[in-house]
Amino acid sequence: MAMTDSLDNALLALLAEHRLPGLSFAVIGGGQITCARGYGFADPARQVPVTADTLFQAASISKCLTALAALRLVDPGRLTLDEDVNERLRSWKIPASEFIQSERVTLRRLLSHQAGINVHGFAGYATGQPLPTLIQVLNGTLPANNSAIRVNAIPGTQPRYSGGGYTVLQQLLMDVTGQPFGDLMQEIVLQPLGLTASAFAQLLPVSLEKLAATGHDKNGQPIPGGAHSYPEMAAAGLWTTPSDLAKFALGIQDALAGQPGAILTPALAREMLTVQAGVYGLGPSITGHGLARKWFHSGRNAGFDALLLTEVETGQGVAIMTNANVNSQVINEILQAIGAMTG
């Protein structure tokens, strides 16, 4: 009880200090979720509290789940890591350019931010704004609010973070399977891992919408236009909870350990968590060496910040989600407070 009280006090103090409306976290240890809690308000105006069941936007952590979907299609041979993705794209093609004359955009390079593709991230669309199709996003045509997604560096020559690359991947997955992206993710990632409080959706189903937090800016003010929609779902479109992110991490760790019925083969799980270039694996980023090696991804959408961090060798980890934009130091303070109390 004393430990719980101390953690509560520490996190509530951080909420007050940094004008955070709310936060939620889940801790992983011993192959299970050992703790999941919520603090503050999901919607301060209506005094709706954050609980362990509150949904937040995962933002760029979406990329890790998208990467898992792609690797699940590699296993049966529907995709391969090192072929030219233009061979599989049907609805849209990567335009010819001087940059892809000798090197190609491959799935491996898309997953590890080595494809030479522009557009770091996406601003999203406030309630009432017209939503572009994915093709309009790829071409940078109205009502899309991003530049055209193009190769503007030779693939394989430099790691450069690219939400645009994951948007190409979204189109690739849809073309290869013939399924809407949200349905595909439900079928081959969310449902198999038991992520029942998660959805890749621009409009949440009613059962989940009522649990969704309201996003806020760095000053704790509600985001104008409400939670933004992200048609670039592969890069930024996941709504979820820390507990569901923890289940995802457990699924990857089970695959790494070769557990029966795991979501991936051990070989693909190892490849996913192996640095390809810079800090990037196939989806997650990797830091540290040996027993200290960790895989992680952070996320920021308008009004939401998040972090998923897992130790490769021990499987210990944590997922943190907030309904306000804060700097990375605040997330680190939250991480340290949780780590100090939970080990």
Predicted regions and their residues:
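A generic structural signal for nonpolar/aromatic side chains embedded in well-ordered alpha-helices
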Residues: 110-111, 137-138, 146, 272
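Well-ordered alpha-helical segments within folded domains of soluble proteins
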Residues: 66-67, 165-170, 246-247
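Acidic-glycine-rich active-site phosphate/pyrophosphate-binding loop
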Residues: 37-46, 138-145, 215-223
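Catalytic loop of the DD-peptidase/beta-lactamase superfamily, centered on the K-T-G motif
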Residues: 1-38, 53, 122, 127-131, ...
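Recognition helices and adjacent regulatory flanks at domain boundaries
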Residues: 127-136, 143-153, 157-161, 168-179, ...
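Active-site helix/loop module of the DD-peptidase/beta-lactamase fold
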Residues: 8, 57-61, 73-123, 171, ...
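Short active-site loop at a secondary-structure junction
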Residues: 9, 13-26, 46-109, 150-164, ...
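Fold-level recognition of mixed alpha/beta catalytic cores in primary-metabolism enzymes, strongest
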Residues: 117, 159, 215-216, 240
